[in-house]
């Protein structure tokens, strides 16, 4: 059974995550005091039910030791996993402006910007030990729920899920990446007028990149690096490995390379997911 602890900055999507987990059969509790986690787990263990509990600045323990002690008191049948949701500062400010809700730290007479920054500092101990960090800045409510449904399949099977995602450096580096590889030095299909409107998922772009030895060498050396350390990552009690591949715009080279790596590890029987951040932004609504 899984004890999913959901944390993150206010406005990042914790309520959405809890609703999605509830739909997946988790027993969900919002803002349960950390010291009561072992009691909840013991109660649910007899019923063989996984649980999800949200923790934020309102029920954050005074010291990390209190949290660690609670984790040590969990019954052996429960595997604790920590999900941390985040979003960039401007997105959080916009979401608060749209909903006109008060920030949990507003009672301290802080401006919204200061409250967001202080909350980030207070939650850092949880963020630093998170098994999975999801950046919801560009996600809709439905996209976040769908991502959780997809990713938790790997987690609940106790299998490492490899996530290969492409992105454009001009849009920023994904904050949820474990590894970031820069492919801006590879030949760029953008300069071919016929290929410019296409993406790395299209055959003509793939054929263009496939003709270049340096592209093959990069893919080979990157997958060899990941294969070298994958056994240690799999035995390190982690559930996700997010590998981000970046080019200038996130449309051609990074998409192609991410797909090649995903296909390779998928063919080796690994639990693999792929996503393309720039292409997802361009989808018609």
From Swiss-Prot:
GTP binds at residues 56-59. The keyword Transmembrane helix does not apply. One of its GO terms (molecular function) is GTP binding. Pfam families: PapZ_C, RapZ-like_N. It comes from the Bacteria. SUPFAM superfamilies: P-loop containing nucleoside triphosphate hydrolases. ATP binds at residues 8-15. Residues 266-285 are annotated as: RNA-binding. InterPro entries: P-loop_NTPase, RapZ-like, RapZ-like_N, RapZ_C. Keywords: ATP-binding, GTP-binding, Nucleotide-binding, RNA-binding. HAMAP family: RapZ_like (MF_00636). Belongs to the RapZ-like family. RapZ subfamily. Homotrimer. NCBIfam families: PRK05416.1. Modulates the synthesis of GlmS, by affecting the processing and stability of the regulatory small RNA GlmZ. When glucosamine-6-phosphate (GlcN6P) concentrations are high in the cell, RapZ binds GlmZ and targets it to cleavage by RNase E. Consequently, GlmZ is inactivated and unable to activate GlmS synthesis. Under low GlcN6P concentrations, RapZ is sequestered and inactivated by an other regulatory small RNA, GlmY, preventing GlmZ degradation and leading to synthesis of GlmS. PANTHER family: RNASE ADAPTER PROTEIN RAPZ (PTHR30448:SF0). This is RNase adapter protein RapZ. It comes from Pectobacterium atrosepticum (strain SCRI 1043 / ATCC BAA-672) (Erwinia carotovora subsp. atroseptica). The lineage of its organism: Bacteria, Pseudomonadati, Pseudomonadota, Gammaproteobacteria, Enterobacterales.
